[in-house]
Amino acid sequence: LGFEGAPSTQNFSAHAEVPFLNGGVGLNVVKDAVGQFSNLGLQASYAYRMQLGIGQIGMGMSFGVFQSGLDGSNFTPASQGDNAIPTGMVDGSKLDLGAGVYYNTQDMYLGFSSAHMTEPIVEWSDGKQYPLKRHYFLIAGYTYDLTSNLLLHPSMYLKSDGATSQMDINTNLIYENMWGGVSYRLDEGIILLAGLEINKDLKFGAAYDVTLMNPMGNSFEVILEYNF
């Protein structure tokens, strides 16, 4: 927020249970843009679920395409003839794989997954290469009953590429059909969260990211979920 070329992300996902496959299928589309750079990911997934102890475990894989590009038409190089800066749009795409495992009970959940498992290298149309590093994700959460209609939901999210890491520590209060909370992203900022269950099928949420160390500035996120 607040300056031209600020980072923006759009994410669309859908999933459905398929009983005869003993699991479910999903579709995920993510589009990112930062300045003149843009990424587009399209993933289809399948997860197998089975009973394990007092909960269920799911194991799945995703398969899709990752596209990245750079629009050099709006760059103003310090010197003419800089071959490192394209004069127009360059892009490329590559097959992409992911996998994960997820366990949940009535009160808790724990999940681990990996993206860009094969570390694909996207070759742009000008011959330059855009490598994708393998990423690892860990999530965990628990729900406490404070009263008959008030729940406390602490959770954590860890993302790492093996060299750098990002960790979020979250706390949400859920009251009937409303929720609100705060998330702390280590060494980066605070995220304020709020949401409303409009009816049994439709949910709306919003988040405001207040950055402490990042020069990119604050950001705003809107989430809309519909269950068919």
Residue ranges and their predicted role:
Residues 1-228:
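Subset of outer-membrane beta-barrel
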